């Protein structure tokens, strides 16, 4: 009799079991990776949630959390803490409860300002005890910000100075888990988390209530990130920000290796856009008011590009807003100071790279120099280590100091207070000088002055010597003292000082002609908060060494006002001078009348940004100038709106005899 059964191969059965086991593991891993894009994952998140919940667990007894008295009033945000009076509530919030219950605050669709919050206890003694009585924490809605005047300031500079000097100590740095090639984002978030004015603003005042964005907002998410990092004792995942990298920068993507410097620039630009959105956006806010945001106060500075023509001495100054400095490290430069010397070195525009001079209307040889017109409060310096090619990274060591003076690289010589202290360093680690892969770590200094080495989730306390010995990729410096506030009184004082110097120069018989004085005065407002722009969106201003001056009457002082002359007027003066048109001059009280001639400086490139009183005596007449006894001054035809121009005294030979006056002081001669 035969037995009926199912024959099973043991080897095949074992292979089937193993296959199903590995397939199930793969499916679980796939589900975890997919869920990580939408949910917070990481070993530290659970610990944070437990601590977070434990902080807000309260007993069922209705006792005040401060004095222990019986009460029925609750915190309107977390609904977990009870108070008996507004004094107890204020005391508890100052002790730290305000930051702890931020995550529970009610979302208000209308933007309000926290500066106007008035915490008052709602006392309803006649109401039933079953009804919940709470403390009113929602402020009155502020006035609308939609209507702006051209002179409006979006963020008071005095408030920024208060945040800049914020001295509230917070906990040590908290690590961030690597979510897959996210080290470049982790180091940027760590550096921003220790930028004092930004952290003080988000923790003390906050951005969520004022945010006007309907979609995802970087500042709102970064505020949540700071709240979590401030109270978390374990590393946590910054997935809420990393998963939104395409929203921060168009070419950034999650899971790819990216450049930390590129992300830093995108993040700063995004925060600037968010600040402008509170007032209607970049298209609504006037250009002058756009320079008065919190982000502009923190990272914004002004870069000056000065080009001087060697043929006509025309100087063109162009100003550009900067959020960071990117310097070359090629050549023999081995220190940060030498790199900045190369950055601000004079460059000759010649050969195939001639300069198109508007005054000469031709391509001529010129001298170009970059300098810092206005130093930012937070200076971010990126060293260009990545060159062309997959193995083109420059791994040479560039020394950098802890205390850094930016004064020698300022166009005006600095204000004497341009001293910075190092507070963050970003380092890129690689193999074989590869530029297409690597790992980012950072060193940050907390608000107590302690240095930490942060490698994703690993945080280690280090000494300053270890920081200064690194091959840095990015350096973040903060000013020892914040930049002085921009006051219009300072600008008026500068103008008054300029007029006083010109008047004294007239009394001494040596009147100077320079269009740079007004250029510097008008740009002085760019350095601190309110920026005065010209009609040109590129902030381009041109100054000239040629001008016209009205003839002064006998016994009266010559009123000299510094002004700039555009390229069109310069060309018209040149044409009149070439046509040989002559005018008459007179002698009054033993002094020659003011005259105007085209003067050319030496072929060497002079730094006209900071003119000295003796600089005017170094001018050399052009070749087409007539001899001392035959030369006749050229006088520009006055328009109805023409103002007084600075004059340049003509040096005549002692043997020359002045011509007699044939026309009155106010008579105009046709140059045609």
UniProtKB/Swiss-Prot annotation:
Its EC number is 3.4.19.12. It is a single-pass membrane protein. It is found in: Membrane. Pfam families: UCH, zf-MYND. Residues 484-672 are annotated as: Disordered. It comes from the Eukaryota. Recognizes and hydrolyzes the peptide bond at the C-terminal Gly of ubiquitin. Involved in the processing of poly-ubiquitin precursors as well as that of ubiquitinated proteins. The active site is at residues 183, 439. The keyword Transmembrane helix applies. Zn(2+) 1 binds at residues 64, 67, 84, 88. Belongs to the peptidase C19 family. GO terms for molecular function: cysteine-type deubiquitinase activity; zinc ion binding. This is Ubiquitin carboxyl-terminal hydrolase 19.
């Amino acid at each position: 009799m035969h037995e009926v059964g199912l024959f099973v191969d043991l080897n095949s059965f074992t292979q089937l079991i193993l296959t199903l086991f590995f397939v199930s593991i793969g499916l679980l891993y796939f589900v975890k990776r997919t869920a990580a894009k939408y949910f917070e994952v990481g070993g530290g998140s659970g610990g944070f949630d437990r601590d977070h919940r434990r902080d807000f667990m309260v007993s069922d007894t209705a006792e005040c959390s401060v004095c222990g008295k019986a009460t029925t009033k609750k915190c309107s945000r977390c609904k977990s803490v009870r108070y008996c009076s507004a004094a107890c509530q204020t005391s508890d919030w100052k002790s730290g409860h305000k930051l702890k219950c931020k995550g529970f605050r009610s979302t208000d669709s209308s933007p309000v300002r926290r500066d106007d919050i008035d915490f008052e206890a709602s006392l309803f003694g006649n109401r039933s005890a079953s009804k919940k009585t709470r403390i009113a924490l929602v402020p009155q809605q502020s006035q609308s910000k939609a209507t702006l005047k051209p002179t409006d300031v979006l963020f008071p500079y005095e408030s920024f100075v208060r945040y800049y000097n914020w001295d509230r100590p917070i906990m040590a740095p908290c690590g961030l888990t690597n979510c897959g090639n996210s080290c470049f984002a982790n180091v940027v978030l760590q550096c921003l988390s220790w930028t004092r004015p930004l952290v003080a603003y988000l923790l003390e005042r906050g951005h969520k209530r004022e945010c006007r964005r309907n979609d995802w907002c970087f500042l709102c998410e970064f505020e949540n990130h700071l709240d979590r990092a401030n109270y978390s004792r374990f590393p946590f995942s910054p997935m809420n920000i990393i998963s939104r990298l395409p929203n921060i920068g168009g070419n950034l993507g999650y899971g790819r290796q990216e450049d930390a410097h590129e992300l830093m620039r995108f993040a700063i630009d995004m925060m600037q856009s968010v600040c402008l959105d509170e007032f209607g956006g970049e298209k609504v806010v006037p250009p002058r008011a756009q320079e008065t945001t919190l982000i502009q106060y923190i990272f914004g500075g002004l870069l000056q590009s000065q080009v001087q023509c060697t043929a006509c001495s025309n100087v063109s100054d162009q100003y550009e807003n900067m959020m960071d400095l990117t310097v070359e490290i090629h050549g023999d430069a081995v220190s940060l100071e030498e790199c900045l010397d190369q950055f601000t070195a004079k460059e000759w525009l010649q050969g195939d790279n001639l300069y198109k001079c508007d005054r000469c209307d031709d391509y001529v040889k010129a001298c170009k120099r970059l300098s810092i017109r206005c130093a930012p409060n937070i200076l971010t310096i990126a060293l260009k280590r990545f060159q062309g090619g997959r193995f083109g990274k420059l791994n040479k060591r560039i020394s950098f100091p802890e205390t850094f003076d930016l004064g020698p690289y300022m166009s005006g010589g600095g204000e004497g207070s341009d001293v910075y202290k190092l507070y963050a360093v970003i380092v890129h680690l690689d193999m074989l000088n590869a530029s297409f892969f690597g790992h980012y770590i950072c060193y940050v200094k907390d608000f107590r002055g302690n240095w930490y080495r942060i490698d994703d989730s690993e945080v280690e306390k280090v000494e300053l010597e270890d920081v200064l010995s690194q091959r840095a990729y990015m350096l973040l410096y903060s000013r020892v003292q914040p930049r002085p506030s921009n006051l219009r009184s300072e600008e008026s004082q500068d103008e008054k000082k300029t007029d006083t110097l010109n008047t004294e120069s007239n009394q001494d018989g040596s009147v100077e002609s320079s269009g740079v004085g007004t250029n510097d005065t008008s740009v002085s407002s760019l350095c601190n908060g309110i920026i005065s722009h010209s009609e040109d969106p590129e902030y381009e201003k041109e100054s000239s060494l040629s001008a016209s001056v009205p003839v002064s009457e006998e016994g009266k002082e010559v009123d000299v006002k510094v002004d700039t002359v555009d390229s069109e007027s310069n060309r018209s003066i040149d044409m009149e001078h070439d046509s040989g048109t002559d005018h008459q001059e007179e002698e009054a009280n033993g002094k020659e009348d003011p005259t105007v001639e085209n003067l050319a400086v030496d072929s060497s490139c002079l730094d006209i940004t900071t003119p000295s009183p003796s600089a005017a005596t170094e001018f050399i007449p052009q070749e087409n100038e007539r001899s001392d006894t035959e030369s006749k001054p050229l006088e520009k035809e006055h328009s109805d709106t023409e103002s007084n121009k600075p004059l340049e005294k003509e040096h005549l030979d002692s043997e020359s005899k002045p011509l007699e006056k044939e026309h009155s002081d106010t008579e105009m001669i046709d140059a045609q």
